[in-house]
Every structure is written in C-alpha cells, then in structure tokens.
Amino acid sequence: MSCPEHIVQLMHKYLDGDILPEDETRLKEHLQSCEGCKKHLHEMEKSIALVQSTSHLTAPANFTANVLANLPKEKRTASINRWLKAHPFLVAAALFAILMGGSFFSSWKNDHDFSVSSQPNLVVKNNTVIVPEGEVVKGDVTVKNGKLIIEGKVDGDVTIVNGEKYTASAGQVTGQIHEINEVFDWIWYKIKSTGKSVFGVKESKE
C-alpha cells in the first residue's frame, strides 16, 4: 500500500470514531478508487473485531500458581546466597564463633606453660599453688597446667585449666569452681571470659 500519509491518518480516525464528516467523505471517495487502501482498512477492522471478541476471556483461577509451579526450581546455591544476604548479623556471629573457636583450640594445643594469677598471698612451689591456712585470697584464682591446694579461703572463683585441685577440710571457696581438662571446656571457658571482659557480664552463682 502506497497511499498518502494523510489517508492513513484518516483511516485511524475513522476506526477510533473521531473522524469529521467531511474527512469521512474524503476517505470513502478515496477507498472507492484505491483497492489497496480498502483492503488495508478491512484488515484493521477485522483485527479490532477479534480483539473486542476476546475481551471477556479471563485466565483460570489457578493459572498463575500452575505457571510458577512449572518454572525451573531455584538452585540451592542461589537460595543459600539469598538467605545469607537476608541474615548478615547471624552470618557475622557464626564467622566470629568459628574464628574464635579455632584460635582457642590452637592456644589449648600449644599452651603447656604453668601460670597462676598474681595474688600476693598465694604460695607457689614448682607447679603447685597453695592457699595457706588462715589466709584469705581476694579475687579470682586461675591456675594453668599445675596443681592448686586450698587450705585457706578464696574470696572469688577458682579456675583450674589442665591441672588438679585439692581442698583441705578447712579450705573454702566463695565463688564457683571450674575444672577445665577438655578442649571443648577450654573453648567455652575462653568464650565466656571474652564475653565478660568485653560486655562486663557476670556469671550467676549456682
């Protein structure tokens, strides 16, 4: 079809119902002498009629659900990645726990040196720490890779790491007693100690 552009515009106005009477007359006169334009207009009328005839059709109620159900399943890695992005705090906490646990495990394996807390009235003989009878040791007492003998009083907690404890009949501990001889106990103890030092958390007495 090689009709002038203004004729094509008149066709569109005619189909939209916006054509002026004098323009409609001009269009009809042209169509009488141009078989191509007449055919083109007829095809457009058929297309419009087809669209209008299907306007009442609606998709089935479960159409969307069925389409979604038949889509390819999301890869597991994509699902995991989305979960990780949605829970950054949990991921950070888990990574922190893993890194700290690894560090504490390494320190447990490599640390075999004897050490003791620094209260002045503790008596140290070789790898044995003694709380003398009649003495009151203020604060927490920690002994690593050694033996603790309590004959007096400890006003605080007692922690024995990879060692042993003996309490005489007159010995007394006002706080808690922790004996750590397994790597998992050591890791848990270090995590709690780190938490107390960072957040100022105190353990409740049992």
Curated annotation (Swiss-Prot):
Q: How is the cofactor bound?
A: Binds 1 Zn(2+) ion per subunit.
Pfam families per UniProt: zf-HC2 (PF13490)
State which residue ranges cross the membrane.
Answer: 88-108
Determine the domain of life of the protein's source. Bacteria
Cell compartments where the protein resides: Membrane
Gene Ontology cellular component annotations, sorted alphabetically? membrane
What is its cofactor?
Answer: Zn(2+)
> Can you tell me which family this protein belongs to?
Belongs to the zinc-associated anti-sigma factor (ZAS) superfamily. Anti-sigma-W factor family.
Protein name, as recorded: Anti-sigma-W factor RsiW
Give the organism the record lists.
Bacillus licheniformis (strain ATCC 14580 / DSM 13 / JCM 2505 / CCUG 7422 / NBRC 12200 / NCIMB 9375 / NCTC 10341 / NRRL NRS-1264 / Gibson 46)
* Gene behind this protein: rsiW
